């Protein structure tokens, strides 16, 4: 692994050359090491199994009413431009027999956000993993994010926010269930 890190540091130095900066100037000397180290966190989702995050479930005391965790902050990196996008995710599900600790829902968002990603796929992955592991009656995930590829390059629209949703099970079949969830996350 150390050889890969050294090779990546040299790649970062090559980027400095490509953009026309001086790889030997004081401010850039340790930048390659810092960038590679930051990737340990930024891309840590590749080293985690999202199903394991939801592995501890509780069956006693499981309810059959909607469970909602909203405004889960996240940061991710766009797979198209390797620029950040960030925002909030709200998750709702209706348990059948299993519930999970709420911190696990936030960790589930984190594991998918910490990968090269597109928001549409991330939103669906969160919902699909909930359905697979918890086997609820339904799940719904809404993500809202600002994409730096839209803000600092391209069309440069600073106020743009992308909204995606993934709707599964009862949420897909029943408009009232969707409306209840949307009511919870709007407040």
From Swiss-Prot:
> Does the UniProt entry include the keyword Metal-binding?
yes
Question: Could you tell me the keywords of this UniProt record?
Answer: GTP-binding, Hydrolase, Metal-binding, Nucleotide-binding, One-carbon metabolism, Zinc
Pathway given for this chain reads: Cofactor biosynthesis; 7,8-dihydroneopterin triphosphate biosynthesis; 7,8-dihydroneopterin triphosphate from GTP: step 1/1
The reaction(s) this protein catalyses: GTP + H2O = 7,8-dihydroneopterin 3'-triphosphate + formate + H(+)
Which SUPFAM superfamilies does its entry note?
Answer: Tetrahydrobiopterin biosynthesis enzymes-like
Gene Ontology cellular-component annotations? cytoplasm
- Offer one Pfam family short name for this entry: GTP_cyclohydroI
The EC code for this enzyme is 3.5.4.16
Q: Where does Zn(2+) bind?
A: 78, 81, 149
GO terms for MF: GTP binding; GTP cyclohydrolase I activity; zinc ion binding
Describe the family membership recorded for this protein in Swiss-Prot or TrEMBL.
Answer: Belongs to the GTP cyclohydrolase I family.
Q: Which NCBIfam families match?
A: folE, PRK09347.1-2, PRK09347.1-3
Quote the subunit structure annotation. Answer: Toroid-shaped homodecamer, composed of two pentamers of five dimers.
Protein's name according to its UniProt entry? GTP cyclohydrolase 1
> Organism source for this protein?
Wolinella succinogenes (strain ATCC 29543 / DSM 1740 / CCUG 13145 / JCM 31913 / LMG 7466 / NCTC 11488 / FDC 602W)
Per the UniProt record, the lineage of the source organism begins with:
Bacteria, Pseudomonadati, Campylobacterota, Epsilonproteobacteria, Campylobacterales
What would be the name of the gene that encodes this protein? folE
